[in-house]
């Protein structure tokens, strides 16, 4: 990585192996590969591949259909869940689910297997950029927990927190923290 990228309007952000711990554990499928393009800090294209199950989610894939919400499933880190997910689940009468990689968690929301993904343990741009690109293209909400937008290609690549969720749940989820 070079800070020369800060002078570019278009920057590729790649995570060749998201979910290293899960990749190392035999039988786990919750690891991913991320590729995203940002333009002026905004993710405009992205793909999240989950090779172990032979699936790739792309920002140009319009197959995503969001089902009626029957229960609120809040997905969080398998190894570093933090209290935020439980707080949201309690406030929205939901239940907690845990998975490994950020890509696998975000794609669970994209595919309708969860409604909310919250992360408070800190990540880096490469952990969330492609999942956010796919989520936004799928009609989901993606932001920081204070509701501010996620801006990429920053000099400090640390992203302290993240919320990806169904749009109709965004206000309720954000209200828990604001």
Predicted regions and their residues:
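Short linear motifs in intrinsically disordered/low-complexity regions
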Residues: 2, 61-62, 162
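Residue-level preference for alpha-helix termini and adjacent loops
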Residues: 2, 16, 22, 30, ...
């Amino acid at each position: 990585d070079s800070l020369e990228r800060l002078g570019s309007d278009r920057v590729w952000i790649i995570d060749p192996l998201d979910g290293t711990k899960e990749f190392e554990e035999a039988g786990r499928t919750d690891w991913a590969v991320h590729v995203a393009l940002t333009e002026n800090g905004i993710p405009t294209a992205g793909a999240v591949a989950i090779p172990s199950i032979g699936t790739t989610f792309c920002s140009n894939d319009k197959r995503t259909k969001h089902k009626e919400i029957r229960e609120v499933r809040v997905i969080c880190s398998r190894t570093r869940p933090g209290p935020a997910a439980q707080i949201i689940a309690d406030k929205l009468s939901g239940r907690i689910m845990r998975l490994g990689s950020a890509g696998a968690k975000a794609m669970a929301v994209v595919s309708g297997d969860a409604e909310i993904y919250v992360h408070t343990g800190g990540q880096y741009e490469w952990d969330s950029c492609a999942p956010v690109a796919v989520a936004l293209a799928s009609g989901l909400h993606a932001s920081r927990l204070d509701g501010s937008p996620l801006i990429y290609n920053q000099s400090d690549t640390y992203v302290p927190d993240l919320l990806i969720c169904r749009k109709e749940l965004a206000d309720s989820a954000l209200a828990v923290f604001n």
